[in-house]
Design a protein with these regions (language model features):
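A membrane-topology feature that recognizes alpha-helical transmembrane segments
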Residues: 1-199
Length: 199
């Protein structure tokens, strides 16, 4: 019984810390006039941190996942609002990836970054601008794949692209018009990468 109470207290403390950090994140996003639903970041970080704690307990993996979630959340909201993402977000993602590199995973992580980054560079160079892949998408996705490694990074990237295609088809069908403007890709890729982190 005391063990259960300890685990429950640790879980609640983890979620509470995530929600406090979310408050500061939301204040910053509001100050920069980003468009977002005010309660949604709290739901996402609260549920996300709870799920990470349930899967990993009080561990470096859990806290790395929460930091990963915060970077992706901020990048997604900024991309949705301005079609840009600050360079510092890629640097933060790179720092998370570097802290995760070990001798056993280095090759997988570098391969994941090379494949995801290379695939996006090809799409950006060969495709049309309206496909939605820009420099911020490439930098953040490449560093996310470096953090996740080959298997999880590629799966996360492919899932994110699939979600983006399906969502844009639904949006285009509902509006009954051909979409010519680029759309924010990072929110979709973020969902894929979070799923990749959890598997």
């Amino acid at each position: 019984m005391p063990e259960m109470i300890r685990i429950l207290c640790e879980g609640l403390a983890t979620v509470l810390l995530a929600l406090i950090c979310t408050r500061f994140l939301c204040k910053n996003m509001k100050k920069r006039d980003f468009r977002f639903v005010p309660w949604l970041p709290y739901v996402l970080t609260g549920c996300g941190s709870a799920m990470l704690f349930l899967l990993g307990g009080l561990s470096p993996w859990t806290f790395c996942g929460i930091a990963f979630l915060f970077v992706l959340l901020y990048a997604s909201v900024q991309d949705h609002s301005t079609h840009e993402a600050d360079d510092i977000l890629s640097v933060m993602m790179l720092m998370l990836a570097v802290t995760n590199i070990s001798e056993a995973t280095a090759l997988s992580q570098l391969l994941g970054a090379a494949i995801v980054g290379g695939a996006q560079m090809l799409i950006a160079l060969c495709g049309k601008k309206r496909m939605g892949i820009g420099g911020a998408d490439i930098k953040l996705s490449t560093t996310a794949a470096l953090l996740l490694g080959f298997y999880k990074g590629v799966i996360g990237f492919m899932l994110g692209l699939l979600i983006a295609v399906v969502a844009q088809l639904i949006i285009t069908h509902r509006k009954k018009e051909q979409r010519t403007q680029p759309f924010a890709l990072l929110p979709y890729l973020s969902v894929g990468f979070i799923i990749g982190y959890l598997i």
